[in-house]
Amino acid sequence: MAQYTNYILVCGGTGCRASQSEQIIENLRAAVEQYGLEDTQVIRTGCFGFCEKGPVVKMIPDNTFYVQVQPSDADEIVREHLVKGRKVERLLYMNPETRELVPDSKHIGFYKKQLRIALRNCGFINPENIDEYIARDGYVALGKALVEMTPEEVIKEIMDSGLRGRGGGGFPTGLKWQITRKVQAPQKYVVCNADEGDPGAFMDRSILEGDPHSI
């Protein structure tokens, strides 16, 4: 498996895709190849959440955050940031109050108070690559539930956690599983209800697009 020291994360959420993020990805990959940067990988991620500033490009490991990037900016980003070691200042986020440039996304007001739990992988991994999800401890809980626990223990764990549905009703998940467990039927189904019409569930799209394996 190839080893990389630099990663270029490009938002592949609906908003950024509508603003040519796919062309940005293509141009970035072409520039990386042109400059012979074998230690650099371009990754399409899920939504970063900061859609009003998209398309968004994030450089890892230094967390430089470029906003409103255009396909024509790709070569400059690779040449200046990776080859010459200089940030492309005109693409950095500007604090609207202080007018100061904020290179690191951790210091942007929109992000700095966030504690992501359900959305922890969105904007960080390639949603179509199961290996990247597993590398972030993906499916560990599922493995434990299937191998180390009984169905009753799993339901009790969910009940005790207080986990609720993400829709407006907030129905207790453990109770839902308990009711389903008691139903006598030769075959049962798991249905993913991703309702974007519910104002309280608009985040469903972000998870489905950006971290589908978590579903």
Where would I find each of the regions flagged by the language model?
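Feature of Fe-S/electron-transfer and energy-metabolism proteins
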Residues: 1-215
